[in-house]
């Protein structure tokens, strides 16, 4: 029995926390750095109208959206993103968790098609300290021009990987950000 259980352990997914069983989808939105909160609010109203379209999204039960900050910390493991006028966050409650993956894909396609100047990151709710589907890479060095060029090379290479989505840098419009 012990040997058999060791053999079966290879089939168990290797992750610290399982996927969340909450029927929720998280949508992170972003416009280019320097966009006013008023413009972000205007764009988000358009997103809300799209989400309210029951013919398009019949499985959306409700949603809450936030502009200028990453929303409240409604789950201990979810750390909101830093506040910025060009950022938004939406929590979507869906009626059927079995349709979550299809809903995420439909949201990605629809939102990106309808709002071409806006960036969307659409994910399922996660457990643990970070989203297990997300990979962060860091490019460091003393020369900002070289760092920027290398980061763009890396982005170009990542775009060639089948199934890779939401590839971006956090160097918004090459805007310097100083945190004190």
Please state what every model-predicted region is.
Residues 76, 133, 179-180:
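Short, well-ordered secondary-structure micro-motifs
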Residues 109, 138, 153-156:
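Short, solvent-exposed amphipathic alpha-helical segments in soluble enzyme
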Residues 62-64, 119-121, 134-136, 166-168, ...:
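Residues at or immediately flanking beta-strands
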Residues 148-180:
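Beta-strand-rich non-transmembrane domains
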Residues 1-2, 38-130:
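Solvent-exposed, membrane-proximal periplasmic/extracellular interface segments of envelope transport
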Residues 1-35, 119-124, 134, 161-165:
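Transmembrane helices with small-residue packing motifs
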Residues 19-24, 28-39, 80-84, 91-101, ...:
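Structural beta->alpha junctions
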